[in-house]
């Protein structure tokens, strides 16, 4: 009798638990569809946060979540969508478009591998699916903050003092649609600025007729696009645009694109772009963007050249820190061209205020870098050059993994008393062009300038990747892979590694570890390569300079 009672009790209890979980699941799914809508928090009475983070991009999110996991009381303020530039208008949508362009290349050339492929492309469908994925990431970011017990405030922040900020534009859940926007004042022992950056528009006549790289992702139809700028964002976008069937022009102010990258690598890229009918206009000093009619723009250069009939003109001439509304001047926070100046601990000129990510620049310490390694070649020459440098030198690395690393390590230092800092040297970089570029360390030109030509040895190779070997086209039209090692001193310390070609974006990551561990050419020579791969060429290179 009692056994039956216990059985019924446990049965109904189990049924209740399962039912509750199912209901919660449906509630979550229902709520999840609206997670992109704002969720507002009312400040808790007398709350003093251990850390207030201004900005919900990669660096801000990383710092906030890590600090919360260290049991700190954390608030995060964001005026737009969570995820920052990277998730919303940068790395993520860009890589999806890069993937689409790569799929195009494979489909277009599949006949060389025996496939009879006919295809069409639906840009609006790709945009829809891409944006759904980004919205999903926005929602995941919001869930992660909730899971880590980070209080999220949505609005625009500005400083009232070194410990207090004003948030404009927040609403609580009981006043979401009616009444004036609330203002909230938060107090924190430490404040982190991670506001990222925004596109720059120069004072050019007709600039209002253009869009930025951010708005590029809103384009669903176009026949002809011009991009003004020659940095990595411009180069990545123009390569995508052409492969999506759009007539493409890129306008470079100087004699070549990507001037800060190794010249030999960029020469290979420019040749590939020209073979794919991407128009590279050099020495292009734009003086006017004229609107002839709707979706009919012309680009006018200072030397009289005119390029016509563009549906869209995209300006990619740089980005600037999004700091002007923070009221930094009230606290005398040191800035340099609007970038917040921080030390190697990410601390600003105000003791309890920090900055990470694209909005800041890190002042290098004064000690001689790599002094033990410099003895491999000509230390005296290098020291003399250093003595002639009187101005401050800064790191300004605008990359998502750098911001994430800096944010997490800052939280560790603040709340676990750890000492590790972000290492801004030898940061691997990839340009998602077609073909992609991977690079670590110094270019050949920079190495010669620092160490002297007599102390630099170059190893390089150019070849046709096996993937393209079966293409039924002229050999000179087949895509090439080019790679280079920049070595310094008698022990041939590798100070730079560069590659352009198929899968370069994946190849370069592992070599970054080797360079960080001070690998030499001998280390590469003594490593057994994997065959047949493009990466094996790094381990079998022969010098052109004896």
UniProtKB/Swiss-Prot annotation:
NADP(+) binds at residues 233, 236, 253, 259, 318, 430. It comes from the Eukaryota. Binds 1 FAD per subunit. The active site is at residue 531. It catalyses: 2 glutathione + NADP(+) = glutathione disulfide + NADPH + H(+). GO terms for biological process: cell redox homeostasis; response to oxidative stress. Keywords: Apicoplast, Cytoplasm, Disulfide bond, FAD, Flavoprotein, NADP, Oxidoreductase, Plastid, Redox-active center, Transit peptide. Disulfide bonds join 86-91. Its EC number is 1.8.1.7. PROSITE patterns: PYRIDINE_REDOX_1. Its cofactor is FAD. Residues 2-46 form a transit peptide. Catalyzes the reduction of glutathione disulfide (GSSG) to reduced glutathione (GSH). Constitutes the major mechanism to maintain a high GSH:GSSG ratio in the cytosol. The active site is a redox-active disulfide bond. Belongs to the class-I pyridine nucleotide-disulfide oxidoreductase family. This is Glutathione reductase. It comes from Plasmodium falciparum (isolate 3D7).
